[in-house]
């Protein structure tokens, strides 16, 4: 029959045909997706519920003028299954995948809350940083040359060639926000700050280096889009979703994106409400380092993991990348194509513009920072310096 887009009616038919519900069951279906690339349906018969996710052959945020391969759905399904191999407690269960229709049927997580929404609403997730730090350490270690035999790693890397979505990252994270491109989207009040950003040659040289790292460093399997909208949370649970951008890339990319989105939320808050975000930033890194170190010592398969002086070098290199990638994410989420509600939903316009100027300023500082021998306290220090020092009008 070939590919066709599901509707709420045909999603129910599909689920029944594949044995998820009885033929006569009264199944309620709603399209609940709020992302840019897919349809997401929730199906519920009163006794059980499932999620059907279907990749569209174009970017929903733009329309059919931006075609995308539906093979990304297979990438996402495979990534979730790889993640589940190492940290099943932090990902939804994948029930099945239909490559022809680009349909994946997964566990319903609606008892949890999208982390971005929860943080905006002032919810606290005490285990968020512990869970994300451990998730990242396990996935990154076990899919790298340190935790996987080199032959196996090369084979696995070949299954995550993801050109369409990697091109989106290359453009929307590393290129477009730093120059005159039609994809950029920002308020006129930011124009002076944007002009200053675009004329900063030192900044552009650093961004070029981070883009090159993303293009060439195939260190481990990365989620590729690990922001707070790609995580479900409750006070006791954390689930990572939507790894359709998964590919082999730099160790520090996912960590940097996650930290940047915590910083964006911090910028949207009053000063006295920010401490929990810095707690999570610092604990994410400390749990990552602790877990990665234990795996390195106990599970390392690469001969040189026995060299005690190598691990600190690896961790410092990762941290350097975390800082720069976080800076790029701050800027792209402020003036690029895909904004975040943390900033865009600040009700007072003057406050919103000020927060966005601060995001641009902080992003620049992070990208340009020479972070040799720096530690995770850097984020708190640069944030306080940027916000308390104000920004140029």
UniProtKB/Swiss-Prot annotation:
Pfam families: APH (PF01636). The keyword Transferase applies. Substrate binds at residues 225, 332. It catalyses: 5-(methylsulfanyl)-D-ribose + ATP = 5-(methylsulfanyl)-alpha-D-ribose 1-phosphate + ADP + H(+). Pathway: Amino-acid biosynthesis; L-methionine biosynthesis via salvage pathway; S-methyl-5-thio-alpha-D-ribose 1-phosphate from S-methyl-5'-thioadenosine (hydrolase route): step 2/2. Keywords: Amino-acid biosynthesis, ATP-binding, Kinase, Methionine biosynthesis, Nucleotide-binding, Transferase. The keyword Amino-acid biosynthesis applies. ATP binds at residues 38, 53, 107-109, 242-244. One of its GO terms (biological process) is L-methionine salvage from methylthioadenosine. Signal peptide: none annotated. Disulfide bonds: none annotated. GO terms for molecular function: ATP binding; S-methyl-5-thioribose kinase activity. Its EC number is 2.7.1.100. Homodimer. Belongs to the methylthioribose kinase family. Catalyzes the phosphorylation of methylthioribose into methylthioribose-1-phosphate. This is Methylthioribose kinase. The gene is mtnK.
